[in-house]
Curated annotation (Swiss-Prot):
Name of the protein in its database record: Zinc finger CCHC domain-containing protein 14
UniProt superkingdom: Eukaryota
Ranges for region Disordered: 25-44, 59-92, 200-221, 236-262, 355-457, 739-779
Polar residues composition-biased segments: 61-78
Alphabetical list of InterPro entries matching this protein: PX_dom_sf, SAM, SAM/pointed_sf, ZCCH14_SAM, ZCCHC14, Znf_CCHC, Znf_CCHC_sf
Keyword annotations: Metal-binding, Zinc, Zinc-finger
GO MF, one annotated term: nucleic acid binding
Species this protein is from: Homo sapiens
Gene3D superfamilies assigned to the protein according to its UniProt record, in alphabetical order: Phox-like domain, Transcription Factor, Ets-1, Zinc finger, CCHC-type
Biased composition range(s): Basic and acidic residues: 395-411, 431-457
């Protein structure tokens, strides 16, 4: 045994001491012949290999690792047994066995268990029939061998080693000879209490082993042998194969021996009680079939222990069911003397973890860890960009995406919000909540979406975001579009594929910047191939709403459905759910046209809009406080999308870039992948490659700016068009350039998108949200505002500034969920032009630094200028988590004040000097954070430097 039992050295003395003491006492009390064996651990019992193994654990050859533990259990059991004799055992306690006749062997389904029937003649002339399993008989013989080494019983027990199937089979081979031997046992052996108990009817299950106090060693041996299946458990109905282990446990329990932990004892009742019952009751055979399940369960315990490298203690627990094993408490573990303190601590910790897991499973039986029944694929938070998990594990997955009419969308909010909120921890309370939510919602949605579920949209997770992966959790929501006939829609594309297929512009991005309590943003991306997006007909039908994703309002995140019309130029409808609180009505732009729509009408518009190519609903929550988006717990999301990235739209000349959609949600978060990249943008997302942004040199369509007060949260749909001139930068930090503001405006205007043309001084105000934006009219694009990305000037410095989606710029850095941190990012490029000029971007200032938000001078600082853009405060965590890199808590120092510092304060954020604004600063842009977390050196576009300090 020692050779096989890693814990032997630890248990050796303790176990030997206990066993020897028990054996000695049992032999002295009831044992006569066994007396010899008792004295010597190895010496007395050497004749009986089984006994030898067991009693002299040190010497014991390896019967099996489990044996040692079993022995220990037996030892405790023995103590129990010792007490048993004292207890009334029925007539058998007074009578002895006169003769044993073997009636026959019967094989049960489980061949491992052969039942042996005996007819026992008692000294009182009574005859009883006893049926024992082969394992019990083997154990019994092994015990006798231990008690009566001179009888050479070991010959009859080819393998006393243990419960191993191999050994059991061997036992069966020689079982006959053993049984025959039992019939011819000498009277002094038959009179032994152990024999009496074994043959007492109640004992059949376990009695035989535990009963004989005098023969504890025998019972131990039996247990060790694997006969252990024996009845103690048997009485309890425990399969005999297990029962051996169980009975071991029971004995200990009964005996209060160190092994009380054996749950079997508990389950059976005290081992003693069992024995008593066994004595009184006719022998009960454990159906082998019962044993099998237990065996499997035991294997489960063994495997579990093996993972913890504690399998050497398996014998201590093998009599326990997995349920009982997992329910062991610290107190229970302390009762196991054979466990070391380290093992107890380890087990305690692991058992607690297991309990928590099981509780979680119970709570969320329907939610698999990664893919909830709702079909939301949870990407465990990992910073790395991994293959996208297909959101659609099942139709349920589609549920996650509300393709339904808007009214159905609401139910989704809860789940999506949960998901988004749980971005940081894929599993956790949130996960539980989600699962419960998802289960209900799934049911609800499944019904709702059965039709739409026909086609599941692949959900692409742009893991690229994960780069900042501070918010590793990306939620991929499978999108179902009935209309989507494109088979490709059904197959989730790996993020790489997404990026690769720029044509798939119709990526649904669910970007929820959830600055949920965690202040982390989850990026939910729903992408489907363009075709998978609603077909034009559907859009025309107004099915768009169905295809459109509903934004989780609770998070105030915007969900963008970019349903690029299959035709590249088809204008995209942008609906921004302004924060409900915001006074501004959402602006919907169709291509060049802009409509002002009240938030309340958004749903309607979505439905009615023939081309719901892009539907953005921002939950008002983010802008909940129209006046200060910054304060809003959840920043709105700003998205730049080109519905179809037709090159044409890219053409700077086009006034309307129907394909390009810019959605600004007050807290501006741009899904990096979604953001359009300037052709130059190194960061450009491959997926977005089609985006015209890069090509466009002009500002965005003025219409995006139409709402003079960008304050209105409504997102403006900015079509990328080159704006011939940039409005003169206004001193106010407000976005001066519409195009830029259109990009950033949402972020810039607190909750409101800064759609207001730069010319409107109100831009500053728009930050406040306080001013309702003027209904955006398809105002002609204000003169293109080319802001110097390097210095933030309106272009007077001579460096060419191209309005570029700054987001593109940042996206990379913030590939993480909080892709667009510009709200937080005070990158000069952002600041200076609000967007990095494509050149600059290309120029290699990898991340433009936002200049002082004030650079209202046409600097598209919209991000900065709409300090709200920097409504970063709420987003800071988000950003920090996401981009860890850029986290600038101060972010645009004034970003918190949606009204960024205005002209009153002329200090330059960038260089710290006073008398000029950062937008006019000639120094490289520096982070606005006062803390000066870092200074980004932004190379002027002329210099093509891709690195940022």
């Amino acid at each position: 045994m020692a050779s096989n039992h890693p814990a032997f050295s630890f248990h050796q003395k303790q176990v030997l001491r206990q066993e020897l003491t028990q054996i000695q006492s049992s032999l002295n009390g009831g044992g006569g012949h066994g007396g010899k064996g008792a004295p010597g651990p190895g010496g007395a019992l050497p004749t009986c290999p089984a006994c030898h193994k067991i009693t002299p654990r040190t010497e014991a050859p390896v019967s099996s690792v489990s044996n040692s533990l079993e022995n220990a259990l037996h030892t405790s059991a023995h103590s129990t047994e010792e007490s048993l004799p004292k207890r009334p055992l029925g007539k058998h306690s007074k009578v002895s066995v006169e003769k044993i006749d073997l009636k026959g062997l019967s094989h049960t389904k489980n061949d491992r268990n052969v039942e042996c029937s005996f007819e026992v003649l008692w000294s009182d002339s009574s005859i009883t029939s006893v049926t024992k399993s082969s394992s019990e008989v083997t154990e019994f013989i092994s015990k006798l061998c231990q008690l009566y080494p001179e009888e050479n019983l070991e010959k009859l027990i080819p393998c006393l080693a243990g419960p191993d199937a191999f050994y059991v089979e061997r036992n069966h081979v020689d079982l006959d000879s053993g049984l025959r031997y039992l019939a011819s046992l000498p009277s002094h052996v038959l009179k032994n209490d152990h024999v009496r108990r074994f043959l007492s009817t109640s004992s059949p299950p376990q009695q035989l082993q535990s009963p004989s106090p005098g023969n504890p060693s025998l019972s131990k041996v039996g247990t060790v042998m694997g006969v252990s299946g024996r009845p103690v458990c048997g009485v309890a109905g425990i399969p005999s194969s297990q029962s051996g282990a169980q009975h071991h446990g029971q004995h200990p329990a009964g005996s209060a021996a160190p092994l009380p932990h054996c749950s079997h004892a508990g389950s059976a009742g005290s081992a003693l009680a069992y024995r008593t019952q066994m004595d009184t009751s006719p022998a009960i055979l454990m159906p082998s079939s019962l044993q099998t399940p237990q065996t499997q369960e035991q294997n489960g315990i063994l495997d579990w222990l093996r993972k913890l490298r504690l399998h050497k203690y398996y014998p201590v627990f093998k009599q326990l069911s997995m349920e009982k094993f997992l329910s062991l408490t610290e107190e229970d573990l302390n009762k196991f003397e054979s466990l070391t303190m380290g093992a107890k601590k380890k087990l305690k910790t692991q058992l607690e973890l297991e309990k928590e897991k099981s509780e979680r499973r119970c709570l969320n039986p329907s939610a698999p860890p990664l893919v909830t029944s709702s079909g939301v694929a949870r990407v465990p938070p990992t910073s790395h960009v991994g293959p996208v998990q297909s959101g659609r594990g099942s139709h349920a997955a589609e549920l996650r995406v509300e393709v339904e009419q808007p009214h159905h969308q609401l139910p989704r909010e809860g789940s999506s919000s949960e998901y988004s909120s749980s971005s940081s921890s894929p599993m956790g309370v949130q996960a539980r909540e989600e699962s419960s939510d998802s289960a209900e919602e799934n049911d609800r949605r499944v019904e709702i979406h059965l039709e739409s579920s026909d086609k599941e949209k692949p959900v692409m997770l742009l893991n690229h975001f994960t780069s900042s992966s501070a918010r590793p959790t990306a939620q991929v929501l499978p999108v179902q579009n009935e209309a989507s006939s494109n088979p490709s829609g059904h197959h989730p594309l790996p993020p790489q594929m997404l990026s690769a297929a720029s044509h798939i512009t119709p990526i649904r991005m669910l970007n929820s910047v959830h600055k949920p309590e965690r202040g982390s943003a989850d990026m939910k991306l729903l992408s489907s191939s363009v075709h998978s997006l609603l077909s034009l007909e559907e859009r025309n039908k107004g099915s768009g709403p169905r295809s459109s994703m509903k934004v989780d309002k609770s998070f105030g995140s915007a969900m963008m459905d970019v349903l690029p019309a299959s035709a590249p130029h088809q204008p995209v409808q942008v609906l921004s759910g302004l924060s409900e609180s915001s006074s501004m009505s959402p602006t919907v732009s169709f291509g060049p046209r802009t409509k002002v729509v009240h938030a309340s009408t958004l749903d309607r518009v979505l439905k009615t809009a023939q081309q719901p190519a892009l539907v953005v609903e921002t939950s008002t929550a983010a802008t909940g406080t129209p006046s200060t988006v910054l304060h809003a717990a959840r920043p709105p999301i700003k998205l730049l999308l080109s519905s179809s990235v037709p090159a044409d739209s890219a053409i700077s000349g086009q006034t309307s870039c129907p394909n390009n959609v810019q959605i600004s949600v007050p807290p501006a978060i741009i899904n990096p992948r979604t953001a359009l990249y300037t052709a130059n943008t190194k960061v450009a997302f491959s997926a977005m490659s089609s985006m015209p942004v890069g090509p466009l040199q002009g500002g965005f369509c003025a219409n995006s700016n139409t709402a003079s007060p960008s304050s209105h949260p409504s997102t403006s749909f900015a079509n990328m068009a080159t704006l011939p001139s940039c409005p003169a930068p206004s001193s106010s930090p407000a976005l001066s350039s519409v195009p830029e503001s259109s990009f950033y405006s949402s972020s810039g205007g607190g909750g409101s998108t800064g759609n207001i043309p730069a010319s409107n001084p109100n831009h500053h105000h728009h930050h406040h949200h306080q001013q309702p934006p003027a209904p955006p009219q398809p105002a002609p694009p204000p003169p293109g505002c080319i802001v110097c990305t390097s210095c933030g000037c309106s272009g007077s410095c001579g460096s060419s500034g191209l309005t570029v989606s700054y987001a593109n710029y940042f996206q990379h850095p913030f590939s993480g969920p909080s892709v667009f941190t510009f709200p937080f990012l005070p990158f000069s490029p952002m600041c200076s032009s609000g967007y990095v000029s494509a050149q600059q971007y290309g120029g290699g200032s990898t991340f433009p630094v936002v200049h002082a938000p004030y650079s209202s001078s046409g600097t598209p600082d919209p991000v900065l200028s709409g300090q709200s853009t920097f409504a970063v405060p709420p987003m800071q965590n988000f950003m920090a988590g996401t981009a860890g890199v850029y986290q600038t808590q101060g972010l645009v120092g004034s970003s918190n004040g949606s009204s960024h510092k205005k002209s009153g304060n002329l200090s330059c954020y960038n260089c710290g000097a006073t008398g000029h604004r950062a937008q006019d600063c000639k120094q490289p842009s520096m982070d606005f954070n006062r803390p000066g977390t870092f200074r980004l050196k932004y190379a002027p576009p002329a210099e093509s430097l891709d690195s940022t300090d």
